A protein has these predicted regions:
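Extreme N-terminus of proteins, especially the signal/transit-peptide cleavage junction
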Residues: 1-3
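Short, glycine-/small- and polar/acidic-enriched structural segments
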Residues: 6, 13-98
Length: 98
Protein backbone atom coordinates (compact mmCIF):
# COMPACT_ATOMS: atom_id res chain seq x y z
CA UNK A 1 0.00 0.00 0.00
CA UNK A 2 1.38 3.39 -1.00
CA UNK A 3 1.58 6.37 1.33
CA UNK A 4 -0.70 9.24 0.22
CA UNK A 5 1.04 12.63 0.42
CA UNK A 6 0.05 16.10 -0.78
CA UNK A 7 2.80 17.78 -2.80
CA UNK A 8 2.75 21.48 -3.76
CA UNK A 9 5.27 22.72 -6.32
CA UNK A 10 5.62 25.51 -8.82
CA UNK A 11 5.19 24.87 -12.54
CA UNK A 12 8.86 24.67 -13.54
CA UNK A 13 10.71 22.61 -16.12
CA UNK A 14 12.42 20.92 -13.15
CA UNK A 15 9.11 19.74 -11.62
CA UNK A 16 7.20 18.93 -14.81
CA UNK A 17 8.19 15.23 -14.93
CA UNK A 18 6.86 14.79 -11.41
CA UNK A 19 3.68 16.74 -12.19
CA UNK A 20 2.88 14.83 -15.39
CA UNK A 21 3.77 11.44 -13.88
CA UNK A 22 6.90 10.62 -15.91
CA UNK A 23 8.78 10.45 -12.59
CA UNK A 24 7.30 8.53 -9.68
CA UNK A 25 8.04 8.75 -5.96
CA UNK A 26 8.69 5.19 -4.77
CA UNK A 27 6.11 4.04 -2.24
CA UNK A 28 4.07 7.24 -2.52
CA UNK A 29 0.75 8.10 -4.11
CA UNK A 30 1.22 11.88 -4.49
CA UNK A 31 -1.60 14.40 -4.78
CA UNK A 32 0.37 16.98 -6.75
CA UNK A 33 -0.72 20.62 -6.97
CA UNK A 34 0.99 23.28 -9.08
CA UNK A 35 0.59 26.62 -7.35
CA UNK A 36 2.12 30.07 -7.46
CA UNK A 37 4.89 30.65 -4.91
CA UNK A 38 2.72 33.21 -3.10
CA UNK A 39 -0.17 30.78 -2.62
CA UNK A 40 2.13 27.89 -1.66
CA UNK A 41 4.02 29.92 0.92
CA UNK A 42 0.88 31.46 2.42
CA UNK A 43 -0.93 28.14 2.73
CA UNK A 44 2.14 26.33 4.04
CA UNK A 45 3.06 28.86 6.71
CA UNK A 46 -0.48 29.81 7.72
CA UNK A 47 -2.20 26.41 7.59
CA UNK A 48 0.48 23.72 6.94
CA UNK A 49 -1.77 22.57 4.08
CA UNK A 50 0.78 20.28 2.39
CA UNK A 51 2.85 17.26 3.34
CA UNK A 52 5.60 18.36 0.93
CA UNK A 53 5.99 21.88 -0.42
CA UNK A 54 8.38 24.53 -1.60
CA UNK A 55 9.00 27.23 0.99
CA UNK A 56 10.47 30.69 1.12
CA UNK A 57 13.91 30.23 2.67
CA UNK A 58 13.70 33.56 4.49
CA UNK A 59 10.23 32.83 5.89
CA UNK A 60 11.33 29.35 6.88
CA UNK A 61 14.32 30.77 8.77
CA UNK A 62 12.07 33.24 10.60
CA UNK A 63 9.56 30.52 11.52
CA UNK A 64 12.41 28.31 12.70
CA UNK A 65 13.81 31.10 14.87
CA UNK A 66 10.34 31.69 16.34
CA UNK A 67 9.81 27.99 17.03
CA UNK A 68 6.74 28.00 14.80
CA UNK A 69 7.94 25.88 11.90
CA UNK A 70 5.94 22.80 10.91
CA UNK A 71 8.27 21.61 8.16
CA UNK A 72 11.76 20.12 7.91
CA UNK A 73 13.87 21.89 5.29
CA UNK A 74 15.79 19.94 2.65
CA UNK A 75 18.40 21.75 0.53
CA UNK A 76 16.56 21.41 -2.79
CA UNK A 77 16.27 24.57 -4.87
CA UNK A 78 13.72 24.15 -7.64
CA UNK A 79 13.21 27.61 -9.07
CA UNK A 80 16.90 28.54 -9.34
CA UNK A 81 15.90 32.16 -9.77
CA UNK A 82 17.25 35.17 -7.93
CA UNK A 83 14.18 36.49 -6.13
CA UNK A 84 15.33 40.03 -5.45
CA UNK A 85 15.04 42.26 -8.49
CA UNK A 86 16.15 45.25 -6.42
CA UNK A 87 17.47 46.04 -2.96
CA UNK A 88 17.09 49.44 -1.34
CA UNK A 89 19.25 51.10 1.30
CA UNK A 90 18.69 54.35 3.10
CA UNK A 91 20.87 57.28 2.02
CA UNK A 92 21.94 57.65 5.64
CA UNK A 93 23.58 54.20 5.55
CA UNK A 94 26.68 55.41 3.73
CA UNK A 95 26.49 52.45 1.34
CA UNK A 96 27.28 53.63 -2.19
CA UNK A 97 27.88 50.37 -4.09
CA UNK A 98 26.90 46.69 -3.73
Amino acid sequence: MKLSLSVAVGNYDRTRALVDGRVQIDGVHPAIMTLSPEEMFFRAFRHADFDITELSLASYAVSLANGANKYVALPIFLSRAFRHSSIYVTRASGIQTP
